[in-house]
């Protein structure tokens, strides 16, 4: 899987842009706030339908414009494909593959597999549970159509149940309807719990070995999947929580409350780890993500590195750069020193200046 070219129109600070990519390492360099990350965002958007920043479509469209376009050519299994994405301020995005519109943008998941790594990925380690759930969901949606289906339906049912909880306080006759939604919530939620548990077990097998290598065998990193409720206990816990749910007008039990813990030698790295340990844990997580995508899809993901090399010491730079050999990588940075110092071969170098891109 490789991205061959990218065209942008009225996307962020780009009025018009056309880029060709090498199947190996591509560098976008320049000062901060020039538009380097916006190019990575466009690729990520085409893979996941979402901005890695969590931005809404209307925020991505260039100021003073009503719509934006992304066109990307990819090669998968030696066959070229064209992907077109049309963003409008007040309408759902439109997507076409090889000129054929798709009904739901979620159908894009799995066509292009990407791994995005930026300094902000420390938030997976440091911030609240929602960041960690987002990581699990984003990765599993790329790897499993079934997970994507169950997640979409779980969120729909959860919203319906929460809306019903707000009405039950005024109309107790709606309790029978609540039971109907509960059965669907249990069905889809149990499937999510099962897949998340299997995913984290696979990640753990990889991350333990990778982190030991990064820490010269001094540390063992383990990810603990903290399901808010066991799959076998979901129905019982939901019943017990009913009165509380009605009082608070929100569902308090289910995979939307799940979390992950990152433990180094048994200690929670979020609470007790140094910034260096947190960075290394984030790097181990991303390296494990790359390996798992390769194992599951039998293909290599596209790696998007957003100014991460400057955040790592030389040893960790080398570990990361060793891992990208043979993988199409698009890197942003402010200078080329890391690549010169590490003698990394680069096929394409572009300089980004205020929304324009020229060969470096």
Curated annotation (Swiss-Prot):
GO terms for molecular function: ATP binding; single-stranded DNA binding. Keywords: ATP-binding, Cytoplasm, DNA damage, DNA repair, DNA replication, DNA-binding, Nucleotide-binding, SOS response. ATP binds at residues 30-37. SUPFAM superfamilies: P-loop containing nucleoside triphosphate hydrolases. GO terms for cellular component: cytoplasm. Its main location: cytoplasm. GO terms for biological process: DNA replication; DNA synthesis involved in DNA repair; double-strand break repair; SOS response. It comes from the Bacteria. It is found in: Cytoplasm. Belongs to the RecF family. The RecF protein is involved in DNA metabolism; it is required for DNA replication and normal SOS inducibility. RecF binds preferentially to single-stranded, linear DNA. It also seems to bind ATP. PANTHER family: DNA REPLICATION AND REPAIR PROTEIN RECF. This is DNA replication and repair protein RecF. It comes from Lachnoclostridium phytofermentans (strain ATCC 700394 / DSM 18823 / ISDg) (Clostridium phytofermentans). The gene is recF.
């Amino acid at each position: 899987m490789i991205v061959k070219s990218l065209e942008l129109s009225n996307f962020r600070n780009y009025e018009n842009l056309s880029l060709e990519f090498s199947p190996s390492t591509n560098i976008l360099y320049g000062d901060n706030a020039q538009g380097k990350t916006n190019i990575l965002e466009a690729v990520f958007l085409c893979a996941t339908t979402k901005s890695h920043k969590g931005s809404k479509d209307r925020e991505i469209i260039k100021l003073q414009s009503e719509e934006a376009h992304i066109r990307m050519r990819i090669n998968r299994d030696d066959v070229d494909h064209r992907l077109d994405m049309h963003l409008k301020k007040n309408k759902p995005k439109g997507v076409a593959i090889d000129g054929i519109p798709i009904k739901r943008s979620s159908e894009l998941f799995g066509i292009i597999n990407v791994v995005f790594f930026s300094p902000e990925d420390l938030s997976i380690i440091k911030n609240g549970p929602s960041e960690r759930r987002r990581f699990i969901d984003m990765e599993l949606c790329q790897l499993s159509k079934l997970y994507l289906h169950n997640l979409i339906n779980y969120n729909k049912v959860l919203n319906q149940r929460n809306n019903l909880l707000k009405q039950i306080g005024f109309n107790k006759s709606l309790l029978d309807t609540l039971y109907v939604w509960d059965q669907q919530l249990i069905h889809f939620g149990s499937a999510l719990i099962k897949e998340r548990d299997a995913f984290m077990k696979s990640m753990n097998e990889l991350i333990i070995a990778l982190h030991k290598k990064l820490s010269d065998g001094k540390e063992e990193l383990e990810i603990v999947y903290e399901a808010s409720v066991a799959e076998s206990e979901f129905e019982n816990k939901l019943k017990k929580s009913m009165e509380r749910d009605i009082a608070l007008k929100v569902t308090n039990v289910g995979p939307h409350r799940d979390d992950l813990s990152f433990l180094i030698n048994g200690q929670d790295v979020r609470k007790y780890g140094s910034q260096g340990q947190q960075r290394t844990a984030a790097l181990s997580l991303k390296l494990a993500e790359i390996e798992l995508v390769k194992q599951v899809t039998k293909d290599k993901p596209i790696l998007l590195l957003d100014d991460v090399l400057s955040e790592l010491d030389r040893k960790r730079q080398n570990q990361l750069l060793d891992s990208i050999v043979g993988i199409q990588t698009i890197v942003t940075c402010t200078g080329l020193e890391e690549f010169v110092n590490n003698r990394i071969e680069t096929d394409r170098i572009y300089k980004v200046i205020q929304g324009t891109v020229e060969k470096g």
